[in-house]
Design a protein with these regions (language model features):
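Amphipathic alpha-helical
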Residues: 1-4
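Extended, highly charged accessory segments
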Residues: 8-11, 31-33, 86-260, 265-275, ...
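Conserved catalytic micro-motifs used in adenylation/nucleotidyl-transfer and phosphoryl/amide-
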Residues: 12-51
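Conserved structural-core and active-site-/substrate-pathway-adjacent residues in large, well-folded domains
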Residues: 36, 77-78, 294, 313
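Acidic, glycine-rich flexible loop/linker segments
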Residues: 46-101
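Short, ordered loop/turn segments at secondary-structure junctions
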Residues: 83, 295-297
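Secondary-structure transition/capping motifs at alpha-helix termini
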Residues: 280-290, 315-324
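Short glycine/threonine-rich loop-to-helix capping motif typified by GTGT followed
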Residues: 299-310
């Protein structure tokens, strides 16, 4: 379990659906995605031949020649060492990998679990001038009554999310929030359907934020220097804790993503450029957690859309070689 927790910091879950066959010249093997949504069957003969394919019968063998046959289970792996002439099964492979390093010790020593932290600081949740804020950030009555209130009060999926036949924002002559200009270009489906609650064995909302250490190819405890979030939505208290973490190696800075409305489009460009430069300078100053905040919105300042601000800072730091 610690092995998987460690590697979940460094890579996304492999959902597939896919069956993967691989070889480096010495080792050859097959692996199935963790949901098992693709068939993968194997046959091992008595004369030391192994066939892995999506269907049985890709190669014809006399039944008396077959030593073993079966199918790869979800997330399982089958490996051949051609030098040793040995077959390694899933349990043996993963046991070796899990025991190669003290993953549990690394996690316990370095990882911070945000949901377990407590703060004596009082955090104010009230919002002044709520109606004005709703207008500034593009929230309408339909968003509030049909989406936010049902989700917040009943914890249920809003029916408002089941379809959207409104005109494209780019063709509208009405003011639109920045997010409305982006649409997924294809319909993403799973077959069979996956439910995040009933399928919680293979699904998670857990997120990690922080600086990657030595990387996935060099297992090291520096990769565990992360904050684990139980889900991507933070309360005001959790955000306050995050920006006031005082553990060794965790340094946080808050940058404002706002611009002067009087300067119009030019002011937005200037503020965005300045925000990117501040982020790069913060990295040089030793900060490894950057919080972008639009809490400074008032009569003379508007928010830089979060999608625009985050993507701009992200790519600016990558181009500068500071995003790790």
């Amino acid at each position: 379990k610690a092995f998987y927790e460690y590697h979940s910091i460094l890579m996304e879950p492999w959902d597939g659906p896919a069956a993967l066959l691989f070889s480096d010249g010495r080792y050859a093997g097959g692996m199935l995605d963790r949901n098992g949504l693709r068939p993968a069957r194997y046959t091992i003969t008595k004369n030391d031949m192994m066939v892995v394919a999506s269907e049985v019968g890709v190669m014809d063998f006399d039944p008396t020649e077959i030593a073993e046959k079966g199918r790869l289970q979800p997330g399982k792996i089958l490996l051949i060492d051609t030098q040793e002439g040995k077959i390694y099964y899933d349990g043996e492979i993963k046991e070796r990998l899990a025991e190669a390093h003290p993953y549990r010790k690394w996690l316990n020593t370095n990882r911070i679990e945000l949901e377990k932290l407590r703060s004596g600081r009082k955090v104010e949740n009230a919002v002044e001038n709520l109606t004005r804020k709703e207008l500034e950030f593009g929230f309408g009555a339909e968003d509030i009554d049909g989406t936010i209130i049902p989700m917040a009060t009943k914890g249920q999926e809003p029916t408002a999310s089941m379809g959207n036949d409104t005109p494209l924002a780019v063709l509208s002559d009405q003011p639109q929030i920045f997010f409305n200009y982006f649409r997924q270009q294809f319909a993403q489906v799973t077959n069979p359907a996956i439910d995040s609650i009933r399928e919680n064995l293979v699904m998670s909302l857990t997120e990690y934020i922080g600086r990657v250490g030595s990387g996935i190819l060099n297992p090291d405890e520096s990769n565990c220097k992360m904050v684990r979030l139980p889900h991507p939505i933070l309360t005001n208290t959790q955000l306050d804790i995050l920006q006031n973490i005082r553990y060794k190696g965790f340094n946080t800075v808050k940058l404002h993503m706002i611009f002067e409305t009087a300067k119009g489009e030019e002011g937005l460009h200037e503020a965005l450029d300045e925000l990117c430069k501040q982020a790069a300078q913060s990295v040089d100053d030793g900060y490894n957690y950057i919080i972008l905040s639009d809490r400074g919105v008032d009569e003379t300042h508007a928010a830089i859309p979060s999608l625009l601000a985050v993507s701009a800072v992200h790519h600016y730091l990558i181009d500068a070689g500071k995003r790790v």
